[in-house]
């Protein structure tokens, strides 16, 4: 970790009067200090609201079953579960109740509970079971002896609800069996804390932005002074993961004549804000996201909030690579020395990543036989190296006349990079070829499924198809992630790593799409309309590609959206979202100045420190503590929000002290 030191420009300004310096400090603290105070106050209000007695989690009051039921039939409910009581009035017929989630695509039914036959007419037998409330459930009741379906129903149970399913004969001329579902006690609204947290957070951001806007209008001169003084901070900020920077230890080289300093790119707050949004969401979901299913990774196909953050981080890393590299080359750095710096940074990212994903300091000596090799930072390191080297090899000066060209149909930002695009298309062709043509022993060629009980249990050990096979072949099962998200619904038993080798190809593609966004920002600087037109075009084109690949379906498309595979449709979909976010952030943050990016801007400026720190200190106080009710979404959500807010606070303090971790 390095602290920023005073530059020559700062020393020259040191001779200003004490009154001017005091005015600058007052201006800085009046905006940022009040923003921070508002943030802390909002966090306190949120914690109090969510933990207040009689809040939204009425589990203790509503989970109790009716008094006339035998205690042995009661299930100890956990988070995201409901109690289902099955009453069987059928004489001479034992029942087997099967269950599966409606989100489990082509899955085998799993035995839920067996219900004995009724001992005599009018006296039903009963059995109790807990059912998942995360998604809709499909229940099928079979005659145990004949294995014949008796009835079938689909229902979305509510958390901590109490339900009864009565199976009985109906005599309407023809003997029929009916299955009637009744609600004994209503479920709780476990999503209410999320709604409260979102509204409070949105209100805090709006209030802070409004206050800062008022401050800038009331004291314009102080605002200018603050902007000038903060420029030195921007010059000293490291380009972690390729973030654009004003200084570099390599700037002592002789400047080539082909690079013009007049094209030096400005630092864009929207880029740092976008990085901060992705990072803070990543911290929140990694800490648990309140244990809500939509803040966890999808079991296989589809998208949740947790599936958005990593590709966005990769995308904005690509944008920063181009902006940073252009700045460094324009200041005269030789390509050879820059290549060495790229290689060293990539090596450090991979090493730090391996250390983070193998936290063995509390479990005794680390066994090399069990070391996990892939991981988030490892993939970032490889992706950064490939994309940065690709841009370095074919780097060209930004043409001056492009910035003044008035045609909105100009494709100079694309045509100037045709060698890079050609190599990216080759890489994508390699991914498609390996995914759909590589023979995998015991599995169908081109298989994209989760294995386990998916596809009706035909391919239990084929998780991930070619992607899983390549990882197991080259790295070995013991060096992969042992608890993939597919195990939740599909009960997979083989190791599978979502940050595996084959998926890295598509992360490179996504980072290069981020490079394209960076080129748009630089090639058409000061031409907001042209930038927004191109962002819109890329958003629509990538979105249409996603529509074609997925057939607007979660599971039935040619290439489903899948985070575990980092499928092509996953890349195009998330890149489309990323261009849309930049389409919103760039005019709001950089052009109009309606929002400063607070509070996401601060962690976006110190991304490596925040990411590594939140991983290392995850299980330490004050980021985690023992909860009064471990089965309460409300308490988990409060803990995770507080922990995330603390990292925002840490990033803010480090920014104020001009401390940034660079690698």
Curated annotation (Swiss-Prot):
The modification Phosphoserine is found at residues 243, 245. Changing residue 431 to C: In MPS3C; results in a negligible amount of protein synthesis; very low enzyme activity; retained in the endoplasmic reticulum. InterPro entries: HGSNAT_cat. Changing residue 590 to V: In MPS3C; results in a negligible amount of protein synthesis; very low enzyme activity. Residues 624-635 are annotated as: Lysosomal targeting region. The active site is at residue 297. It catalyses: alpha-D-glucosaminyl-[heparan sulfate](n) + acetyl-CoA = N-acetyl-alpha-D-glucosaminyl-[heparan sulfate](n) + CoA + H(+). Changing residue 237 to A: Displayed both lysosomal and plasma membrane localization, reduced intralysosomal proteolytic cleavage and enzymatic activity. One of its GO terms (molecular function) is acyltransferase activity. Its EC number is 2.3.1.78. It is a multi-pass membrane protein. Changing residue 633 to A: Loss of intralysosomal proteolytic cleavage and enzymatic activity, retained in the endoplasmic reticulum. Disulfide bonds join 151-462. A signal sequence is predicted but has been shown not to be cleaved in the endoplasmic reticulum. This is Heparan-alpha-glucosaminide N-acetyltransferase. It comes from Homo sapiens (Human). The gene is HGSNAT.
């Amino acid at each position: 970790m390095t602290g920023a030191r005073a530059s020559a420009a700062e020393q020259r300004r040191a001779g200003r009067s004490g009154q001017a310096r005091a005015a600058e400090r007052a201006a800085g603290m009046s905006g940022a200090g009040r923003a921070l105070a508002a943030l802390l106050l909002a966090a306190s209000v949120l914690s109090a609201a969510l933990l207040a007695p009689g809040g939204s989690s009425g589990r203790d009051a509503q989970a109790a079953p009716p008094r006339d039921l035998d205690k042995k039939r009661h299930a100890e409910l956990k988070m995201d579960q409901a109690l289902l009581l099955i009453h069987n009035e059928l004489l001479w017929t034992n029942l087997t109740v099967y269950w599966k989630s409606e989100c489990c695509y082509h899955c085998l039914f799993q035995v839920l509970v067996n219900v004995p036959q009724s001992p005599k007419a009018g006296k039903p037998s009963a059995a109790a079971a807990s059912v998942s409330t995360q998604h809709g459930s499909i229940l099928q009741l079979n005659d145990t002896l004949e294995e014949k379906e008796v009835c079938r129903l689909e229902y979305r149970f509510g958390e901590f609800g109490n339900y009864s399913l009565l199976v009985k004969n109906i005599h309407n001329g023809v003997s029929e069996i009916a299955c009637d579902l009744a609600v004994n006690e209503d479920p709780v609204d476990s999503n209410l804390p999320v709604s409260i947290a979102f509204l409070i957070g949105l209100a805090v951001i709006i209030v802070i932005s409004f206050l800062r806007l008022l401050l800038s209008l009331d004291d314009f001169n102080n605002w200018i002074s603050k902007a000038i003084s903060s420029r030195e901070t921007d010059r000293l900020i490291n380009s972690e993961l390729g973030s654009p920077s004003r200084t570099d230890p390599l700037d002592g080289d002789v400047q080539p004549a082909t690079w013009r300093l007049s094209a030096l790119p400005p630092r864009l707050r929207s880029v740092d804000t976008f990085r901060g949004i992705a990072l803070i969401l990543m911290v929140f979901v990694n800490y648990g996201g309140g244990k809500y299913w939509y803040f966890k990774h999808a079991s296989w196909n589809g998208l949740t909030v947790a599936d958005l953050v990593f590709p966005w981080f990769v995308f904005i890393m690509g944008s920063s690579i181009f902006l940073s590299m252009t700045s460094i080359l324009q200041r005269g750095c030789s390509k050879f020395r820059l290549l060495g710096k790229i290689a060293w940074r990539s090596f450090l990212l991979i090493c730090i990543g391996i250390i983070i994903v193998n936290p063995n300091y509390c479990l005794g000596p680390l066994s090399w036989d069990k070391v996990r090799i892939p991981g988030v930072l490892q993939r970032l390191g490889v992706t950064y190296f490939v994309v940065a080297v690709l841009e370095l090899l074919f780097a060209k000066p930004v043409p001056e006349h492009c910035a003044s060209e008035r045609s909105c149909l100009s494709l100079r930002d694309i045509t100037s990079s045709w060698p890079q695009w050609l190599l990216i298309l080759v890489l994508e062709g390699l991914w498609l070829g390996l995914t759909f043509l590589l023979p995998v022993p015991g599995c169908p060629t081109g298989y994209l499924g989760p294995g386990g009980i998916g596809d009706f249990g035909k391919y239990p050990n084929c998780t991930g198809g070619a992607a899983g096979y390549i990882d197991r072949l080259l790295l070995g099962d013991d060096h992969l992630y042992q608890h993939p998200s597919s195990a939740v619904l599909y009960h997979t038993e083989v190791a599978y790593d979502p940050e595996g080798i084959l998926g890295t190809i598509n992360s490179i593609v996504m980072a290069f799409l981020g490079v394209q966004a960076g080129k748009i920002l630089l090639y058409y600087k000061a031409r907001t309309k042209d930038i927004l037109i191109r962002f819109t075009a890329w958003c629509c084109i990538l979105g249409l590609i996603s529509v074609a690949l997925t057939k607007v379906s979660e599971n039935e498309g040619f290439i489903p959206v899948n985070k575990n595979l980092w499928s092509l449709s996953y890349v195009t979909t998330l890149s489309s979202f990323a261009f849309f976010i930049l389409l919103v952030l760039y005019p709001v943050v950089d052009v109009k100045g309606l929002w400063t990016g607070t509070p996401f801007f601060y962690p976006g400026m110190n991304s490596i420190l925040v990411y590594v720190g939140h991983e290392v200190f995850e299980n330490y106080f004050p980021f985690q503590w023992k909860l009064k009710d471990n089965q309460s979404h409300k308490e988990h959500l409060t803990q995770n929000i507080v922990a995330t807010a603390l990292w925002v606070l840490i990033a803010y303090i480090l920014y104020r002290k001009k401390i940034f971790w660079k690698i």
